[in-house]
From Swiss-Prot:
More details: Apnoia means lack of air in Greek.
Function: Transmembrane protein that plays a key role in trachea development by regulating crb localization and maintenance at the apical cell membrane. Required for anisotropic apical surface expansion important for tracheal tube elongation and lumen stability at larval stages.
Gene: apn
Binding partners and assembly: Interacts with crb.
Protein name: Protein apnoia
Chain segments annotated as transmembrane: 7-27, 55-75, 76-96
Length: 137
């Protein structure tokens, strides 16, 4: 209960301090109110001139920041695309290793054809008969 009383006392002190500060500001503003009447409360000519000078550099900075963010976005999306492709390949590899292999239907292999002997000629002379050697496969 004592903690609640301390909190309430601190809030009351804070409220009184704020009220005192605001009261002093209102007293100071009442003496300056005569000079404020002469100047309009809308944005004057000088303010618009200052804003127009600051508008071009501000737009340039905003454009540069936008361009850099766009480039960063493109590079990030490119990296994301490569990562997704690698992820799909890895998942496919894991699935191919995890799933059982279904054997294809067994077909009888065709017999290997017997090849004719290959002539090998050791001489450049056309008068001699070629020597026939059989190659064993």
């Amino acid at each position: 209960m004592a903690a609640n009383q301390k909190i309430v006392f601190a809030l009351v002190c804070l409220f009184l301090a704020c009220d005192l500060v605001l009261g002093q500001q209102q007293a100071a503003n009442s003496s300056d109110s005569d000079s404020d009447v002469a100047e309009s409360r809308t944005f004057g000519h000088h303010f618009l001139r200052r804003i127009s000078f600051a508008l071009v550099p501000g737009a340039f900075v905003v454009g540069v920041i936008t361009t850099l963010l766009a480039a960063l976005t493109v590079v990030s999306i490119k990296g994301l695309g490569v990562g997704v492709i690698l992820l799909v390949l890895a998942i496919g590899q894991m699935l191919s290793r995890a799933l059982p292999v279904q054997a294809a239907a067994a077909y009888a292999a065709a017999p290997v054809p017997v090849q004719a002997p290959v002539p090998v000629v050791y001489s450049h002379s056309h008068t001699q008969q070629p020597v026939w050697l059989e190659k064993e496969w």
